[in-house]
């Protein structure tokens, strides 16, 4: 009965996420190691959350896709200016999701690309973007599918700046989003209601 609610992508092989990352990142550099560590942390939690949804709420979830998308969600950081996490590009860090989408779109990974674009914060609405004058497209960048929401939520429990720290508690993850306003907190709270404590 459990397996009937897990959606596995039977019509394709799982993609080689490490191979995709290595197209853009030099292996065993500080940035590569940080990205792999963070993405693996997020992927493990995202898989656990996905399976919990299947087991407790009997919701169909594409677990393979969740794992793949979690590994690739931050692929765009390489082009950003964030030296504290070894990123020496020119783009503002807030654009890493948009950049990641473009990278994965070019590879034909359109569904994975949307996760890149929609995982920042608890998603960004056009109102958030305009109010904060963010250097992003003027459109909603909100996680829509269940899988997108799982990866977005799981990402909030880990820090690239402090990759060796334990996963954040729900209250700490929520507190990190307070500065982004009530709408962001409301979206996070809805995800927390759906997915629970990590």
Model-identified regions with their sequence ranges:
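Alpha-helical scaffold segments in carbohydrate-active enzymes
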Residues: 45-48, 156, 190, 194
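Divalent metal-dependent catalytic cores for phosphoryl transfer on phosphate-bearing substrates
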Residues: 61-170
